Amino acid sequence: EKVGENNVNIKTDSSEFQIVGQSGENFPVMNIVEENANKLSIEKEILKNMIRRTNFSASIDESKGVLVGELIEINQNDIRMISVDGFRISVYKEDMKNENLNDIIIHAKTLSEVLKLLSESDIDEDVELIIGSKEALILLDKTKVSIRLMEGEFIKYKDILPKDCNTRMKVDRKFLMQSIERASLMAKEGKNNLIKCTIDGNLLTINSRSDEGSVKEELIVKKEGDNIEIGFNSKYILDVLKVLDDEEISIEFKNSLAPC
């Protein structure tokens, strides 16, 4: 029940709410994307996977500029979504035919909200992405989401991706995740949740230690190349393992000091 210009009363058999509102004229108007904006259709499940598998490694530090966003590259034969937080890089590539479009950067928090929208929708149809010079629109069924694009130059991520490896390990994803979760119980937060991984032959040993005690986990793996001993922040590894669906995953190492 509307009361006066901007107030509303909501009544039930046993409750009554009085809500003070504001004039609808104060609500921000949705920005209009140019008529000549580029358009792209993408399967809903593909877009969900792209966001889910990259969103976790975008920076949450607003002082890092565009690193709080995710880069979307739309190439002739594929589309890629990239996030970087200064410690991790996530790149998701999906093969699909497109027109070559300009790269765009969208805030990771915005993409997280888009992921919620896609996950809650039971509409099984493609998502339309309309890209303007400063704004983008995401259209799904009767829902329209207006997004302000971020300005700035994204980090040249290809220059810092490992280009070769001396050790390759294949391992059951769930077993590895469970072992790291147990090892991380003793990983010291002040030491960046450090765990030590040693690959010797086809045996992976995971160790962690703190003032409260120590943990040792062993897993059988398939190894190619050199033996290696390397330390990791357990949280960073778990973040990756939790968004993957594969039963078996491959991890490549260059040496004990280089990223994997």
Stretches found by the model and what they are:
Residues 1-260:
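Structural preference for solvent-exposed beta-strand-turn elements
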